[in-house]
Amino acid sequence: AFAQTGTIRGTVYEEGTGEPLFGVSVLVKETSTGAVTDFDGKFEIKVAPGSYTLQISYISYSSINLTEVVVKGGEVNVVSDLLMAEEASDLETVTVSASAIRTTESALLSVKRNAANLIDGISASTFRQIGDGDAASAVKRVTGVSIEGGKYIYVRGLGDRYTKTVLNGVDIPGLDPDRNTIQMDIFPTNVIDNIIVSKSFTADLPADFTGGVVDIETKDFPEEKTMRLSLSGGINPSMHFNSSYLKYDGGNTDFLGFDDGTRAIPTDGRTDIPQYGDAVGNPNGAKGMEYQEILGNFKKTLGGYRASSLMDVGVSFSLGNQIARPKATWGYNFALTYKNETEFYQDAEYNLYAKPREADQTELEPLERQRGDFGVNNVLLGGLVGIALKTDHSKFKLNLMHLQNGESKEGEFEFVNTNLGANFEAKQYNLEYSQRGLTSILLGGAHYINGNEWEINWKLAPTRSTISDPDIRFTRFREPTNTVSTEVGLPARIWRDLEEYSIVGKADIAKRISLFAREGKVKFGGNYVFKQRDFNIQSFQFATGNTEFRGDPNEILLDQNLFSADNRNGVRYNADFIPINANAYNSIATNMGGYVSMEANPAEKLKAIVGLRVEKFNQYYTGTNQTGTIDYDLVEVLDDMDFFPTVNLIFNLKDNQNLRASASRTIARPSFKELSYAEILDPITGRTFIGGLYPETTNGGTEVLWDGNLVSTHVNNFDLRWEAFQERGQMFSVSAFYKTFEKPIEMVQFLSDPGTFQPRNVGDGTVAGLEFEFRKSLKFIAPSLENFSWNTNVTITKSQIEMSESEYRSRQLSAREGQVIDDKRDMAGQAPYLINTGLSFNSYVTGWEAGLFYNVQGSSLQYVGFGNRTDTYSVPFNSLNLNINKTFGADERIQAGLGVDNILNSKREFVYESYQAQDQIFSSLSPGTKVNLRVSFSF
């Protein structure tokens, strides 16, 4: 009988560029059989079980002898990251043991070292070493990157507005369409090849970024068959198995991330429903009976209950392989992930403070104080299916992804109001549910002509995103009388729905050329993006008439308390969206772009890439203002036609050292929500967002504080970087960057309405910064520390905004005695420093891996003060996390891990800051310390 054959697969890269090498000869010395690498630099050879030597050769490159390539029957031996250097007169064949090749990080570092633009990244091998289960955990280890709320990525301390996330090079919306960055925790690391962060702009990238573009690259062709099941559980002593946890009974499918109709609006979304005035005169008439039917169909539950909370659980499954056929190779990936997480915040605070009227008083005065508990249950269900086909000269891929997210909240708060003389204390109850869905399809192809002389890439990606907030419930009783009134706020029910469609198409064509007697590349292409959003809010308020209550919110809508022919002064609803619904809008945006760029080596040690991008962006709005005096019907609210030049230079100082310089122009545009008249309330915090089209005036309308003309922000970017690379992935780099902002958009506090925030263009600004990064093995201290390494990256920035005339004047008018008002301030959202550092241990022999990681971001301006509304700043969150992993079992197919998050028990806080005043709490949450256990099985 014949022994079952095995397979050798690998990838060959050019050391000088980090690009895959096409046409490399790979010969098995013992059998004289072999293969030639394809356009991805990949090869595959079938051999009998045994130990072999691979002879790898390519014209003008130093050959490689790869020894100790062990092949087992029916299995795949993957030899990744074979780097071939251009041949020099004193170079001979390089011999290396296959057992020494452990990681794809070296290929990523090679790409980073030789890329003409400034990039950072993290590879799949690092995911496995550290034990990161999702992209959010992994990407925060990249230089200059931080994660907000465990999900959203910031680059160089710049906020979400200036960071963009793409999937396989294509722009897709996330579960929150108002963010540029998609939730990073929805991608399991076992379907990701690399995460690349581009910090400098090149013409083939979208122009709407400043801090960085984060590209999540999923696997096309797994090198070997992979089947992986991962289980995880998390316990936070302050949140889990806590009998004081707040919840309420929802639908039967909440555990899957969507409502089953339990929270459906009783009017079916109609706008022609009767009001109280239509029913009170004739309760038994047609409108009166319809009014009572609708009133009776509102769910009675307005308050939750306390019960023991459950721990966090998660499960993910992935499957992938490639199937070689005589004329083509097929690849497939499948991933399914499920998370069910519970949070419980006790003594949460949300406050409003302002400067007193008297200029000689510096301490801030409370307007509203809210303190209490709230529970959150968050469910995420996601699926990803990928199919790829590779022929001799082409590659095609199809990815389908669906994400479903459901989040329920229940809160109970003590509320104190001292604003405008309306002094009262109240008990507040909140019930919320939000469900979000994202369905995305990506179809793409790559074609190679004349070997790899010509390369054509194209992608088409339609996406549908939905958000539904069914039946948000708010109730507030005045204490101690347990009365309900307009003064304390009437009970309210809110239904919000958003539906967004987008389609992205792009094509890139690259041609290898000879320029300055050296190899170069010309690249050109274009893209088209279409997005449409429908947004609608329908809200109801409930007047209670003469009905008396005992402080139980579930009493209010009992049948005996409702309006009827016998109880005409009972509880009744009023539909706030009739006759004008200013919170409903429709928006359309189109973006048509094109570019041309050239990559060349004008001197032996100098590489340059220059390019020009043009984008035509239009946004249209349909909606009305709050008073109904302005009615837009597909009115153009943004019309941008911009050119974006870019230059990137890299000078090779030595074989392992580079000096980089880049300059470019980019843009940041307002979102659909920001370019609207919508008012959107967050019932838990009591804060309201108002669209940027809404103007604000004072002094009887004679002084304009904001004109409602929200425009895009143009950004000029300049970068300089020195970097040195050493063996085993060690490196050191120093970077400097400088950015100018024309009319940046920031969230400003509305002067006439406390707790309301609006996006506005402010004065021009600048950001200057330094970045430091090193990765160093501790072997230089002692040989026994060979398995220890220290990774650190630090970003330090200084930002400055020139205040607008209205902001500067408002600050002068509300200045305290002795206070000197400068016409410049910090830029909103820009952290002054960012520190990522970690000590890692990795032993391939024993299978133990461990790491202690620290991350902190400096205090940054979140909401811009105006008049007597003072600035709000974040408080640094000192994140210290521990990860320990152990692989064991046959072929190390089992991995178990322990993680401890927020070891220092830091709080997430934002505070008001004012001249010679004690900082006051804007918001405060205590996430506590969490212990995570995980185990994964590879089959």
Tell me what each language-model feature is.
Residues L490-L498, D508-S514, E519-V522, V647, ...:
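Conserved C-terminal beta-signal and adjacent last beta-strands/turns
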Residues Y433-G444, K459-T463, R496-K506, R512-G570, ...:
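Structural signature of Gram-negative outer-membrane beta-barrels, strongest in the C-terminal barrel
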Residues V70, E75, A100-Y154, D160, ...:
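Periplasmic N-terminal accessory/gating domains of Gram-negative outer-membrane beta-barrel systems
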Residues T7, D278, G285-G411, T439, ...:
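Transmembrane beta-barrel wall of Gram-negative outer-membrane proteins
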Residues M731, A736-E742, T756-S860:
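Gram-negative outer-membrane beta-barrel transporters
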Residues E487, L498, S502-D508, P553, ...:
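Outer membrane beta-barrel strand-and-loop segments of large Gram-negative receptors
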Residues Y13, T17, S25-L27, S57-Y61, ...:
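Short, acidic, small-residue-rich periplasmic hinge/interaction motif at the N-terminus
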Residues T31-K42, V704:
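Short, acidic Ser/Thr/Gly-rich low-complexity loop/linker segments typical of extracellular
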